[in-house]
UniProtKB/Swiss-Prot annotation:
Disulfide bonds: none annotated. The lineage of its organism: Bacteria, Thermotogati, Thermotogota, Thermotogae, Thermotogales. NCBIfam families: leuA_bact, PRK00915.1-2, PRK00915.1-3. SMART domains: LeuA_dimer. Belongs to the alpha-IPM synthase/homocitrate synthase family. LeuA type 1 subfamily. Homodimer. It holds the Pfam family HMGL-like. This is 2-isopropylmalate synthase.
Length: 513
């Protein structure tokens, strides 16, 4: 069987999903999970784009051991320099730069305003420049699927001659159909000189719902690497979903003689961790990881499954790490049991972070009798999301009733600074949001608000995921508590903290600017 490399770009392209931004700590934890999952390459970010992106790439590069860590760069010298600075401490065979430039007529005319020869010269110059610092260089011709094939062949030929070790073919706007994309890969495989000496990669977007199909067509026509994201998250309609591509190869190995290094039993835990970190919940009918995948409501289907599961299921829940055993720990469970349970889901924490998780676990175990798997995911992601210098909810009080005007008072703290405010609203949640706005002097617009139960039974925690629009940018927040008003306030503050940190409005030593 031919081995297909899995290039995961959840931390870079996936993070470009509106509201899916991750803190540095969250990126590191997600990268460790991706390493356990078995991906071959992790694209950690775009180092030149911001100090936070630079530091995230650097931290991921120092945290993981096995995968190749990749930094993105335009065909611009400062981009390549930044990628090198972020990755220079990593062994040469474990670091890669991914340089790109657009090649399609529409990009040449309207975005780059360059002629073909200028683009070829940039490829030659900057792939060669990157090669001075990196043994492994991937070159992408952005919008390749809408580029004239003869020019595309020339672009990839130029990149290989300049030292590229991987050429990547992006279907940047998800425009291609599987048969034509497969034919394009075949044409490149046959027509680009030197292509037999490099990896041939594809990066498919899902605008027409064909990202996975196009990636499969590419592999069937000679691609050796596929670029993916967990849960298919990414720009616009997203990217080729890791879990779908990998499980198609596993389930249909009778027709698809390809394999990957993915440990499929960690797919569901990885998906759940990403959901808790980003707040982006896969639709219930999402293939592989959706909540409905192994549920059967029709009487005929239920009868068939009870008699033999394979009548209506083509894979087992255990194939992707889903288990019906959800009850895990209680108030008498110790650190060893907690750490062991987390490790079964591929979650590895340093001692300081684990201690914070254990403290929150014991607090929760005192408040509810039974602690479930989803409770643990919530605790871990809550700890990872806590900005070191962000505002925290110290105290709140809500006064409400069906004959009263709901009011809320809050006390927020960052460093040694406290802010207090009270406001009325259309219900207790609206009142506490308005009180937070007043305390911080910010006027966000609530774009999305979702509440769901974590665990089962009357003691279940409420998990709130929301998205705020501030300065015309989206920031996601998440909060968990047995009190849904408190969970809502935590989520709201979490999103605002992301905004304040992104804009440099929180001092490093605590306190707001």
């Amino acid at each position: 069987m031919r081995r297909i490399k899995i290039f995961d770009t959840t931390l870079r392209d996936g993070e470009q999903s509106p509201g899916a931004s991750m803190s540095i700590e969250e990126k590191v934890e997600m990268a460790l999970m991706l390493e356990d999952l078995g991906v071959d390459l992790i694209e950690a970010g775009f180092p030149v784009s911001s100090p936070v992106q630079f530091e995230a790439v650097k931290r991921v590069a120092s945290a993981v051991q096995k995968p190749i860590v990749v930094g993105l760069a335009r065909c611009v010298e400062k981009d390549i320099d930044a990628a090198y600075e972020a990755l220079k401490d990593r062994p040469k065979d474990k670091r890669m730069i991914h340089v790109f430039i657009a090649t399609s007529p529409i990009h040449r005319k309207y975005k780059l305003r360059m002629e073909k020869e200028e683009i070829l010269e940039r490829i030659r110059r900057y792939v060669g420049y990157a090669k001075q610092f990196f043994d492994l260089v991937e070159f992408s011709a952005e919008d390749a699927s809408r580029t004239e094939v003869p020019f595309l062949i020339e672009a990839y030929k130029t990149a290989i001659e300049a030292g590229a070790t991987t050429i990547n073919v992006p279907d940047t706007v998800g425009y291609a159909l599987p048969d034509e994309f497969g034919e394009l890969i075949k044409t490149l495989r046959e027509g680009v000189p030197g292509i037999e000496n490099v990896d041939l990669s594809v990066h498919c977007h899902n605008d027409l719902g064909l990202a996975v199909a196009n990636s499969l067509a590419a592999v069937q026509n000679g691609a050796t690497q596929v670029e993916v994201t967990l849960n298919g998250i990414g720009e616009r309609a997203g990217n080729c979903a890791l879990e779908e591509f990998v499980m198609i190869l596993k389930v249909r190995k009778d027709k698809l003689p390809y394999e990957t290094g993915i440990k499929t039993e960690l797919i569901y835990p990885a998906s759940r961790l990403l959901t808790h970190i980003t707040g982006l919940i896969p639709s219930r009918n999402k293939p592989i990881v959706g909540e409905n995948v192994f549920l059967h409501e029709s009487g005929i289907h239920q009868d068939g499954v009870l008699k033999h599961r394979e009548t209506y299921e083509i894979m087992k829940p255990s194939d992707i790490g889903r288990s019906s055993e959800t009850l895990v720990l209680g108030r008498h469970s110790g650190k060893h049991a907690l750490r062991k349970k987390l490790e079964t889901y591929g979650i590895k924490l340093d001692e300081e972070t684990f201690q914070k998780v254990f403290e929150k676990f014991t607090e929760l175990a005192d408040r509810k009798k039974e602690v479930y798997d989803d409770d643990l995911f919530s605790i871990v992601s809550e700890v990872l999301r806590e900005p070191i210098n962000g505002y925290k909810l110290v105290h709140f009080h809500v006064h409400t009733g069906n004959t009263l005007l709901p009011t809320a008072a809050v006390v927020l703290q960052v460093g040694n600074e406290k802010r207090e405010a009270a406001e009325a609203g259309n219900g207790p949640v609206d009142a506490i949001f308005k009180a937070i706005d007043k305390a911080l002097g910010i006027q966000p617009k609530l774009e999305e608000y979702i509440i769901q139960a974590v665990g089962t039974g009357k003691n279940a925690q409420g998990e709130v995921k929301l998205t705020l629009r501030i300065d015309n940018e989206l920031y996601s927040g998440r909060g968990v508590s047995t009190d849904i008003v408190e969970a809502s306030a935590i989520a709201y503050i979490n999103a605002i903290n992301k905004y304040l940190i992104a804009k440099g409005l929180l001092r490093k030593n605590g306190g707001a600017e």
